[in-house]
Amino acid sequence: MLAAALLAGGAAPVGDPQRGAEIVRSRSSGLCVLCHALPGVPAVHAGTLGPDLAGVGARYSSDQLRARLVAPERFNPDTLMPSATRRDGFTRVAPGRASLPLLSAQQLEDVLSHLETLK
């Protein structure tokens, strides 16, 4: 999706870490908090299925974070984490969301921008 925008002559969206924090913590859009613990989110409201995201910005480069969001199965073939950009492979999707990726190109940049701040 981002590559298509760049090839079409569009500029890559610039991420906003504040918007990214809202998406990551949302239980209705990004959904990250359903599986991951996050700094500032009470344990009772955070998941434990995926790794804790505290310090993720120190553990991975921006490119590594992007790769993990776009193709998580490359790093763990048994992962339950969905791709943030693909439209296939989802089950039990709300009818209005069936043909949409989990995150738009702008939302992906926002989430990456936020994750990079988690040092």
State where each predicted segment sits.
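C-terminal capping alpha-helices of c-type cytochrome domains
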Residues: R86-K119
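The canonical Cys-X-X-Cys-His
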Residues: G20, S28-P39, L65, V111, ...
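Electrostatic cytochrome c docking/interface patches
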Residues: A8-R27, G40-P42, K119
